[in-house]
């Protein structure tokens, strides 16, 4: 092996060791493969450089998600406009990293439909089942884990995907909710907003284990969406810690204010 190859191999090993403790480094090992055209409009994944450097708002997302993994934040709300790759980081790479760090834990990811939740699940499963993940954490996906909506780690940790619908038998150490309301039309429907809120009260909250973390990711189209029902009015358009209406202390990462027009 040439000196150059040895240096490259050493650098790869250093990167893998750093990735065990750093979500940002772990994400960097998977990207650009994990960035998709629908996350970054107009940018095809094959056109990305070999080493993707997260944008400033991505670094903020990664920083706060890392604090969730470390137990420093139990309630995190990420509010952002569409097309900012928030789901790639928060609903795909973060649960994969989290399950590498906590391979016996249970993760539930919910979205507006079962199909979208399954899509996040497949991508997270592929990350946990990758050679990259195994080289970082020394373990990975259990054998024969082909189901889109439910899979396990070798140590017995579980990942479950669901739409906004009743689900039984799953309790979570980490609960991810990603755009529970489909878009402006649904957000403007009082019936949809109320049914989504009742799902949160009746299905989500009872599934949180004691000490569990909840990360809510969404684009805001209506002030009466789930985020609006949780947060106090003084939190709108701001980032930081807030005492919420649900009696919990939430950290809000607001990357965009409430969207006022469909074009924004």
Language model regions located:
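Short, flexible loop motifs at catalytic/binding sites
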Residues: 1-84, 88-264
């Amino acid at each position: 092996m040439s000196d150059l190859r040895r240096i490259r191999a050493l650098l790869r090993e250093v990167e893998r060791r750093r990735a065990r403790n750093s979500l940002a480094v772990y994400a960097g090992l998977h990207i650009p493969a994990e960035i998709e055209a629908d996350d970054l409009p107009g940018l095809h994944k094959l056109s990305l450089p070999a080493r993707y450097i997260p944008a400033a708002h991505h670094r903020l997302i990664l920083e706060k998600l890392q604090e969730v993994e470390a137990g420093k934040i139990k309630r995190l709300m990420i509010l952002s406009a569409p097309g900012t790759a928030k789901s790639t980081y928060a609903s795909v790479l973060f649960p994969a990293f989290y399950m590498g760090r906590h391979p016996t834990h249970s993760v539930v990811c919910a979205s507006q439909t079962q199909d979208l939740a399954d899509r996040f699940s497949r991508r997270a499963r592929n990350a946990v089942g990758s050679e990259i993940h195994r080289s970082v954490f020394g373990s990975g996906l259990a054998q024969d884990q082909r189901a889109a909506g439910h899979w396990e780690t070798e140590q017995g940790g579980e990942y479950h995907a669901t739409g906004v619908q009743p689900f039984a038998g799953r309790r979570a150490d980490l609960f991810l909710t990603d755009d529970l309301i489909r878009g402006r039309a649904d957000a403007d429907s009082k019936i949809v907003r109320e049914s989504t809120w009742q799902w949160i009260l009746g299905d989500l909250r009872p599934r949180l284990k004691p000490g569990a973390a909840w990360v809510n990711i969404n684009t805001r189209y209506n002030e009466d969406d789930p985020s609006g029902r949780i947060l106090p009015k003084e939190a709108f358009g701001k980032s930081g810690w807030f005492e919420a209406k649900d009696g919990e202390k939430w950290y809000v990462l607001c990357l965009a204010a409430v969207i006022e027009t469909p074009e924004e």
